[in-house]
Amino acid sequence: MRKGSPKKRTLLPDPKYKDTLVTRFVNNLMKGGKKNLAYDIFYSAVDIVGDKTGESGLEVWKKALSNVFPSVEVKRRRVGGATLQVPIEVRPERRISLGIKWMLEQARLRGEKTMQERLAYEIIAASQGEGKSVKKKADMHKMAESNRAFSHFKI
């Protein structure tokens, strides 16, 4: 018998901007439990973004994240021996999680010297609708569009 879903954990807002989305981002950025280092990297990256763009670094970061959030994704479903990719709408929580993970994944693959610079330049690129994280979202949407014929299947 199922016991129901676990309680949602509440996140504390970050110390500088008082924003829980920043905390989520930093928690994904963190490696090996080194949260202070993750905060330092994030705040430095936001400062670099602010210097390069001349706008508020946090606002540019939020715009970049919203450009990376996917609205549809594909899930595999087996139908009569064939595996179909069925497009489904992404839940809001998962949308945020995917966007954050994609942005960090692509920032880590960039060629700049420090993580602060990599993250900053990925944020700037994503805020302008460019960059690999935005391309990943576009690829996901393209995949969902090309498999639209299977959207009537239930997952």
Swiss-Prot record:
The keyword Cell wall biogenesis/degradation does not apply. It holds the Pfam family Ribosomal_S7. It comes from the Bacteria. One of its GO terms (cellular component) is small ribosomal subunit. PROSITE patterns: RIBOSOMAL_S7 (PS00052). One of its GO terms (biological process) is translation. Keywords: Ribonucleoprotein, Ribosomal protein, RNA-binding, rRNA-binding, tRNA-binding. One of its GO terms (molecular function) is tRNA binding. The keyword Cell membrane does not apply. Part of the 30S ribosomal subunit. Contacts proteins S9 and S11. One of the primary rRNA binding proteins, it binds directly to 16S rRNA where it nucleates assembly of the head domain of the 30S subunit. Is located at the subunit interface close to the decoding center, probably blocks exit of the E-site tRNA. HAMAP family: Ribosomal_uS7_B. Belongs to the universal ribosomal protein uS7 family. NCBIfam families: rpsG_bact (TIGR01029). This is Small ribosomal subunit protein uS7.
